[in-house]
Design a protein with these regions (language model features):
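Phosphoinositide-binding peripheral membrane targeting modules
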Residues: 32-48, 52-104
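Intrinsically disordered, low-complexity segments enriched in small/polar residues
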Residues: 1-2, 64
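A general marker of short, structured functional hotspots
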Residues: 12-15, 72, 78, 120
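Pleckstrin homology
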Residues: 115-133
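Canonical phosphoinositide-binding patch of PH/PH-like domains
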Residues: 100-119
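Anionic N-terminal interaction surfaces
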Residues: 2-49, 113, 130-133
């Protein structure tokens, strides 16, 4: 307790790994607002992210069965700064780092695949177009 307020111990920094573009599933479609447009969807073995013209919606499956899902919404308007890190000699996975208002850090990693660079640039361009027009 801090100054009469209960402070939750929440991990504000998250890392999500993606490797390919896929069609939008019915489950995630129900989380999309009528006033936003889906641009594309990416996935890993368990997690998925929907990139719209307004936000990133990440479905983070929990536990060994993956039946429990935690949904993260990252509105583009809350991004303070962002950076692209390309693949190197020892670190083969490029990533986009997002710093959100409140100091939250989100890392979107793109696992080595033949379409990795195109997918990284697609995500970067979507964020960039929102941020600077």
């Amino acid at each position: 307790m801090l100054g009469g307020c209960v402070v939750a111990n929440v991990n504000l920094n998250k890392v999500f790994n993606f490797y390919e573009e896929v069609p939008l599933s019915g489950t995630l479609r129900s989380f999309i607002s009528p006033n936003e447009n889906v641009c594309f969807v990416v996935k890993t073995v368990r997690d998925m992210a929907v990139f719209t013209d307004k936000r990133i919606l990440v479905a983070d499956k929990q536990g060994s069965t993956g039946k429990k899902v935690e949904y993260y919404t990252i509105p583009f308007k809350n991004i303070i700064t962002y950076a692209v890190e390309t693949a190197g000699t020892f670190d083969l996975d490029p990533e986009i780092k997002l710093i959100l208002s409140g100091g939250v850090t989100i890392e979107l990693k793109f696992v080595k695949s033949k379409n990795m660079d195109q997918l990284l640039l697609k995500v970067y361009n979507l964020i960039n177009n929102f941020m600077i027009g």
